[in-house]
Regions:
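Non-catalytic, mobile gating and regulatory segments of ester bond hydrolases
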Residues: 1-220
Length: 220
C-alpha cells in the first residue's frame, strides 16, 4: 500500500514503514491480538528516533494504532510526535458499540472486506488464502475490540483525512478533533475507504502539509 511513497514526500524526509505480522510478506506470522503488545513493539522500534521530528501516518486500524502510540509516549514522558495523520478511521472509543465483529461468520467477514474494497474478490475464493486473510482480520478486530484507550487527548497535532464515499460521519471527525490538545485539520478527498490505493498522493499531500506547517511554526 505504501510502496513508492518515498517519491511523494519532501526529499529531506526519511520514510519508514511498519509491516505488521499477518500482513503481505509476513502473512504467515502470528498477528498481534492486543494493542499493548503492538504498541510496545513500535515504541522499541522508534527509540532511535527519540531526538528527531517524528510524524505518524495510520490508515484505518493503523490510525488507532498511531493514536495509541502517541498516548503511550505521553504516558511515559517521551517526546510527543510532531504530528499524527489519521486516514479512513473512526476515532478511539472506550467501549465497543456493538457485538464483536471478530465473532462473525466467515461469510459475514468476507462481505465486510468486499464492501470496504481493497481486497480482490479472487483472493477470497481460494480456501487457503481466505483462511489466512480472515485469521489476520479476526486478530485485528480482537486487538481493537479489547483495547481501552488511555484517558485524555494527545498533545500532537492531528490531520484527519477520509474519502467522500467512505462511511465516516461528522461525529467521527469531531471525535478526532476532541482527541488532541493541539491543532486539528480535516480533509475530505475523492474515493472510498481505500482511496489511497488509487491516489496515494492525496494522502502524502496531507502528510507533507503537516510536516511543512510544523516546520514553519517551529522556525517562527
Amino acid at each position: 500500500m505504501f510502496l513508492g511513497w518515498e517519491r511523494l514526500v519532501p526529499h529531506d524526509t526519511q520514510l519508514l514503514a511498519l509491516r505488521y505480522p499477518g500482513r503481505e510478506a509476513r502473512l504467515t506470522h502470528a498477528p498481534f491480538r492486543r494493542m499493548s503488545d503492538l504498541v510496545e513493539q513500535i515504541l522499541s522500534a522508534t527509540l532511535f528516533l527519540e531526538d528527531m521530528d517524528l510524524y505518524l501516518f495510520g490508515h484505518s486500524m493503523g490510525a488507532l494504532v498511531g493514536y495509541a502510540v502517541c498516548q503511550e509516549m505521553k504516558a511515559r514522558g517521551r517526546r510527543a510526535p510532531s504530528g499524527l495523520v489519521v486516514s479512513s478511521s473512526r476515532p478511539p472509543r472506550g467501549t465497543p458499540e456493538s457485538a464483536p465483529i471478530r465473532t462473525r461468520s466467515d461469510a459475514s467477514l468476507c462481505e465486510e472486506l468486499l464492501a470496504l474494497g481493497g481486497t480482490p474478490p479472487e483472493v477470497l475464493k481460494d480456501p487457503a488464502t481466505r483462511e489466512l486473510v480472515l485469521s489476520s482480520l479476526r486478530a485485528d478486530y480482537e486487538l481493537l475490540e479489547t483495547w481501552t484507550p488511555l484517558e485524555g487527548p494527545i498533545d500532537s497535532p492531528i490531520h484527519e483525512i477520509h474519502g467522500d464515499a467512505d462511511t465516516l460521519t461528522e461525529d467521527d471527525v469531531d471525535g478526532w478533533r476532541r482527541s488532541t490538545t493541539s491543532d486539528f485539520h480535516s480533509r475530505t478527498v475523492p474515493g472510498g475507504h481505500f482511496y489511497l490505493s488509487d491516489s496515494p498522493a492525496l494522502a502524502t499531500h496531507c502528510l507533507t502539509d503537516l510536516i511543512r506547517s510544523r516546520r514553519t511554526t517551529n522556525h517562527q
